[in-house]
Amino acid sequence: MDVKWDSMTFDEMEEVKRNVFFTTLEQLKGWARSNSLWPLTFGLACCAIEMMAVGGAHYDLDRFGSFFRASPRQSDVMIVSGTVTKKMAPLLRRLYDQMPEPKWVIAMGSCATAGGPYVKSYSVVKGVDQIVPVDVYIPGCPPNPAALIYGIHKLKEKIRLEAKTGKKVL
C-alpha cells in the first residue's frame, strides 16, 4: 500500500509517529540481543554468592530476559566474579572462546576488575581484562545484587548503542 505523505493531515502524521516504528535490521537485532542476554556464570569467590542472589526470587533476573546458563555454547555474556588465579586463566579463556559471537564479558567485584585484596599475590591475575576483553566493570567487594543488575542494564545500553551506530563502544 502506498501512502501519500503530502496528503496526510497533521493529526494523521502524529498518529503514524505514535504507531509506526522505523528502524534498521541491525537495530532490531541489537534490541533483541539486549533483551535476551544469557549469562554464563563464572563464580570464583564471595561475589558469586551475590550473583546467585540475583537469580533468586527477590531480584529475579529472569524478568529482565536473562537466564543463567551452565554451558558456554548457550551463553552470550560471561560474568566473572571473584579472584582469577594464573592457573584458572587458561580455563577462563577457553570458556570465552567456546561462546558464540556476539559475546560480552562483565567483571564483577574488585577481584575480577583489578585483583582485589589479593593483588600482591604471585598467583593472582591483576584483572580479568588481561585474559578476555571486558565490556562492563562492576566495582565493590562484593558488589550487591542491585549493582549487578545495574551493570547488566549498562551492557544492554551498550549493545543497543553499538547496533545503532555500527561502531564498537568502549
From Swiss-Prot:
Cite the source lineage: Bacteria, Bacillati, Bacillota, Bacilli, Bacillales
Family per similarity comment? Belongs to the complex I 20 kDa subunit family.
List, separated by semicolons, the cofactors it needs.
[4Fe-4S] cluster
GO CC, one annotated term: plasma membrane
Question: What detail does the entry give on cofactor binding?
Answer: Binds 1 [4Fe-4S] cluster.
Q: Which HAMAP family match?
A: NDH1_NuoB
The EC code for this enzyme is: 7.1.1.-
The membrane topology of this protein is: Peripheral membrane protein
Task: Describe, as the record does, how this protein assembles with itself and its partners.
Answer: NDH-1 is composed of 14 different subunits. Subunits NuoB, C, D, E, F, and G constitute the peripheral sector of the complex.
Q: Which locations, inside or outside the cell, does it occupy? A: Cell membrane
Q: What domain of life is recorded for the organism?
A: Bacteria
Q: Which GO terms describe its biological process?
A: aerobic respiration; electron transport coupled proton transport
Q: Which residues form the signal peptide?
A: none
Q: What does this protein do?
A: NDH-1 shuttles electrons from NADH, via FMN and iron-sulfur (Fe-S) centers, to quinones in the respiratory chain. The immediate electron acceptor for the enzyme in this species is believed to be a menaquinone. Couples the redox reaction to proton translocation (for every two electrons transferred, four hydrogen ions are translocated across the cytoplasmic membrane), and thus conserves the redox energy in a proton gradient.
* Taxonomic source organism: Geobacillus thermodenitrificans (strain NG80-2)
Q: Where does [4Fe-4S] cluster bind?
A: C46, C47, C111, C141
Full protein name: NADH-quinone oxidoreductase subunit B
> Major location, coarse class?
membrane
Pfam families per the UniProt record, alphabetical: Oxidored_q6
Q: Which UniProt keywords apply?
A: 4Fe-4S, Cell membrane, Iron, Iron-sulfur, Membrane, Metal-binding, NAD, Quinone, Translocase, Transport
Q: Does the keyword 4Fe-4S apply?
A: yes
Q: Name one GO molecular function term.
A: iron ion binding
Q: Is Hydrolase a UniProt keyword of this protein?
A: no
